[in-house]
């Protein structure tokens, strides 16, 4: 197994989530190398993805909402807008330096990365999206990157090892590379999807410190792909939190090249069935990638699923789940294995919901749902506290995975899921030492 020596020590827990093989889309090659961005002189820090199919690919992207958008975010967003998502064939990524808050030079460097990638891989102008991740405020070692891009040409391929090398090359404080792949069927045609992501800290909704890209050989219009990606991201990468910080760089990109054939999937009525089937496939895929980011949360010992049900709206349900997920008091209680449901209620109470009827205290219930299949443990039922068996609660909190169900009892029937982790001493250590 290829392991990035520049990332935190690969733990036994994390190794469970690194695949030993995969299925990969037709017409794409990927790779990763060390070019000299990272200080240790050997860790992979430059990755590329390229469409080798005989026709241009379509792309969609979702970017950070942070006001201090990094140079690669601005450059990539402009490229997507200029081309309406059509004719995007490559992604170039460096790790170890965010190229954020780097002024005009940062913009020039991001554009240069795209131009050199276009040239090396034989694409027409403006065919490449750029991503960077790492320390904010430092200029890129751009000469190292630009001389490294041509070296990628001989290191790309479509094997599992190539995909794993690509996933490793985008890591920073991650403990393991995040790679997911799967095959699926639409209208009798078999398609494949594969993707990588990075992120372990500075993760919260609306695109935080994470990068991710996934590709498929299904034929999808750029407009349909953008709508599907936005829907999927809202229910995956924008439904996770590690520490509540939103980064300057985060980007999720989807690319479809149509190499597996079949009818074009568009967003019109004649394609409705295939459109919604693809939306389901992309959403579940994005959720798997996003959940790997949470599992690798800096210093995390628990993976927590928050399920809010019977809300008046999806927006209310997600807002409440997000409020709990970003509560430091809740997260530290989970690390301490303390069934302090008062912290959950507190976070529910100050969440940003739409109306006064969105939360009715005497209809609200909170339950621990064990992931080992044993009996759930009610903590609060219709606003009334239960007599909690602390020994049973402690038993549940010993599990690595935990689900907490919040039933709002509004009669609205809407629900949302959100994924988070606990907050530990190690999180402080990792981030206190980040630049050293």
UniProtKB/Swiss-Prot annotation:
InterPro entries recorded: Arg_biosynth_ArgJ, ArgJ-like_dom_sf, ArgJ_beta_C
Reaction it catalyzes: N(2)-acetyl-L-ornithine + L-glutamate = N-acetyl-L-glutamate + L-ornithine; L-glutamate + acetyl-CoA = N-acetyl-L-glutamate + CoA + H(+)
Gene3D superfamilies: arginine biosynthesis bifunctional protein suprefamily, ArgJ beta chain, C-terminal domain, L-amino peptidase D-ALA esterase/amidase
Listed EC numbers: 2.3.1.35, 2.3.1.1
Pathway: Amino-acid biosynthesis; L-arginine biosynthesis; L-ornithine and N-acetyl-L-glutamate from L-glutamate and N(2)-acetyl-L-ornithine (cyclic): step 1/1; Amino-acid biosynthesis; L-arginine biosynthesis; N(2)-acetyl-L-ornithine from L-glutamate: step 1/4
Subcellular location: Mitochondrion matrix
Entry's Gene Ontology molecular function annotations: glutamate N-acetyltransferase activity; L-glutamate N-acetyltransferase activity
Residues involved in substrate binding: 172, 198, 209, 298, 431, 436
One BP term from GO: L-arginine biosynthetic process
Record site feature (Cleavage), residues: 208-209
GO cellular component, one term: mitochondrial matrix
Catalytic residues (UniProt): 209 (nucleophile)
NCBIfam families: ArgJ, PRK05388.1
Subunit structure comment from the entry: Heterodimer of an alpha and a beta chain.
Protein family per UniProt: Belongs to the ArgJ family.
Function: Catalyzes two activities which are involved in the cyclic version of arginine biosynthesis: the synthesis of acetylglutamate from glutamate and acetyl-CoA, and of ornithine by transacetylation between acetylornithine and glutamate.
HAMAP family referenced in this protein's UniProt entry, alphabetically: ArgJ
Miscellaneous section: This protein may be expected to contain an N-terminal transit peptide but none has been predicted.
Name this polypeptide is given: Arginine biosynthesis bifunctional protein ArgJ, mitochondrial
Source species of the chain: Meyerozyma guilliermondii (strain ATCC 6260 / CBS 566 / DSM 6381 / JCM 1539 / NBRC 10279 / NRRL Y-324)
């Amino acid at each position: 197994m290829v392991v990035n020596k520049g990332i935190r020590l690969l733990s036994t827990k994390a190794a469970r989530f690194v695949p030993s093989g995969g299925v990969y889309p037709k017409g794409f090659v990927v790779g990763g190398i060390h070019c000299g961005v990272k200080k240790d002189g050997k860790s992979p820090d430059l990755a590329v993805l390229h469409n080798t199919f005989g026709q241009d690919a379509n792309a969609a992207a979702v970017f950070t909402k942070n006001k201090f958008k990094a140079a690669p975010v601005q450059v990539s967003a402009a490229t997507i807008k200029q081309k309406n998502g059509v004719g995007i064939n490559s992604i170039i990524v460096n790790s170890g330096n965010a190229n954020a808050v780097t002024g005009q030079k940062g913009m020039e460097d991001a554009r240069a990365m795209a131009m050199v990638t276009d040239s090396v891989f034989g694409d027409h102008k403006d065919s490449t999206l750029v991503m960077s991740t790492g320390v904010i405020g430092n200029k890129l070692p751009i000469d190292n990157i630009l001389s490294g891009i041509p070296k990628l040409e001989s290191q790309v391929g479509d094997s599992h090892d190539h995909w794993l090398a690509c996933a490793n090359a985008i890591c920073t404080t991650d403990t393991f590379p995040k790679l997911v792949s799967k095959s699926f069927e639409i209208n009798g045609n078999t398609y494949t999807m594969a993707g990588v992501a990075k992120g372990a800290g500075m993760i919260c909704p609306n695109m935080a410190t994470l990068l991710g890209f996934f590709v498929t050989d299904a034929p999808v219009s750029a407009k349909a792909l953008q709508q599907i990606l936005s829907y999927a991201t809202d229910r995956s990468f924008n439904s996770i939190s590690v520490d509540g910080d939103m980064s300057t760089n985060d980007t999720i990109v989807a690319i479809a090249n149509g190499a597996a054939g079949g009818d074009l999937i568009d967003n019109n009525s004649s394609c409705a069935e295939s459109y919604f089937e693809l939306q389901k496939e992309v959403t579940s895929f994005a959720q798997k990638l996003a959940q790997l980011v949470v599992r690798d949360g800096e210093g995390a010992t628990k993976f927590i699923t928050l399920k809010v049900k019977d809300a008046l709206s999806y927006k209310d349900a997600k807002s409440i789940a997000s409020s709990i997920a970003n509560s430091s008091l809740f997260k530290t209680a989970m690390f301490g294995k303390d069934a302090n449901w008062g912290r959950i209620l507190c976070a529910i109470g100050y969440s940003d919901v739409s109306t006064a009827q969105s939360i009715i205290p005497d209809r609200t219930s909170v339950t621990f749902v064990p992931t080992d299949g044993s009996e759930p443990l009610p903590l609060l039922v219709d606003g009334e506290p239960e007599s909690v068996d602390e020994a049973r609660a402690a038993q549940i909190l010993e599990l690595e995975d935990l689900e907490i169900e919040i039933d709002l009892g509004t009669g609205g029937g809407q629900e949302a899921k959100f994924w988070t982790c606990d907050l530990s001493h190690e999180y402080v250590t990792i981030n206190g030492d980040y630049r050293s």
